[in-house]
């Protein structure tokens, strides 16, 4: 069975079909009659709920688990864990984890694995949401960088998957952030030094929260300085183009990446992203079943 761990093994045709399915906003009920395990080892609201609803729409029965209540607490290895799921008829594993051992899951052939957020490595269905939103808002322009990510790109799986997806479509992405939050791999990136450069080069931006839970002991962030330089405020929005689209994968930390006076501006499009949440997860399930 296929996996959707990231976009490494997804060809351009399949990727375009995934985007089209996500853009369609379809909620058509089906009766696939399959079993899926939603294993979330990190907190989640939108991702977990939208996967559960998407499965329900497709007739996929879901069960839930996490490392806290699994035999991993007793030392069970991954191979035995997956063999157990397969023996019980689980065909799809939807996994959210803080770990980065994504390649270990590529080896499994009798169960399809979807990344619902994999360490700082991948979050493919969120990337589908974000880029589908941009297409729906007509923000993909070959003359411009489709999107500039602002904030903690170093630790962001949303950034990594968005970058990978857009690279497959032939685009570079922009970055505007503190030097300590730049990714190690800077290939195919446009690195901007000011808000003015961002607005001159992109039709859309995506704000990313500082991932405090992933900061290492040797990574220090001066939050006062960060907020002063990279927080999106109403004043800064007023200097942007009238048709700018501002995305955010959520949860939003008001007062850090965006000010309270800016959150309700008409340019803020997180509600458009939310409308694509269930369709993106429907698309992921269908991709695993070779229906896309």
Located regions from the model:
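Adenosine-phosphate binding glycine-rich loop
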Residues: 243-244, 250-292
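Short, structured coil segments at secondary-structure junctions
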Residues: 58, 108-110, 169, 187, ...
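Phosphate-coordination loops involved in phosphoryl transfer and adenosine-cofactor binding
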Residues: 30-36, 143-147, 243
């Amino acid at each position: 069975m296929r996996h959707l761990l990231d976009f490494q093994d997804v060809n351009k045709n399949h990727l375009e079909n995934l985007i089209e399915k996500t853009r369609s906003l379809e909620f058509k009920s089906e009766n696939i009659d399959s079993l899926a395990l939603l294993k979330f080892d990190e907190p989640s609201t939108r991702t977990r709920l939208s996967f559960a609803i998407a499965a329900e729409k497709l007739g996929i029965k879901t069960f839930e688990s996490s490392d806290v209540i699994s035999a991993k607490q007793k030392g069970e290895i991954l191979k035995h864990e997956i063999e157990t799921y397969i023996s019980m008829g689980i065909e799809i594993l939807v996994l959210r984890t803080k770990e980065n051992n994504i390649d270990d899951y590529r080896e499994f052939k009798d169960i399809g694995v979807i990344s619902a957020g994999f360490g700082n490595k991948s979050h493919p269905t969120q990337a589908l949401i974000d880029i589908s939103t941009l297409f729906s808002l007509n923000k993909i322009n070959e003359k411009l960088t489709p999107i500039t990510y602002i904030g903690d790109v170093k630790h962001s799986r949303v950034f990594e998957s968005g970058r990978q997806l857009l690279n497959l479509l032939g685009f570079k992405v922009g970055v505007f952030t503190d030097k300590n939050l730049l990714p190690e791999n800077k290939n195919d990136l446009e690195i901007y030094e000011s808000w003015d450069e961002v607005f001159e080069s992109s039709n859309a931006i995506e704000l990313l929260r500082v991932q405090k839970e992933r900061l290492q002991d040797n990574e220090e962030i001066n939050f006062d300085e960060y907020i002063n330089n990279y927080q999106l405020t109403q004043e800064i929005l007023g200097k942007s183009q009238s048709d700018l689209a501002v995305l955010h994968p959520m949860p939003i930390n008001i007062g850090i990446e965006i000010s309270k006076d800016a959150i309700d501006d008409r340019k803020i499009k997180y509600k458009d992203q939310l409308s694509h949440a269930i369709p993106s997860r429907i698309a992921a399930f269908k991709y695993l079943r070779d229906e896309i």
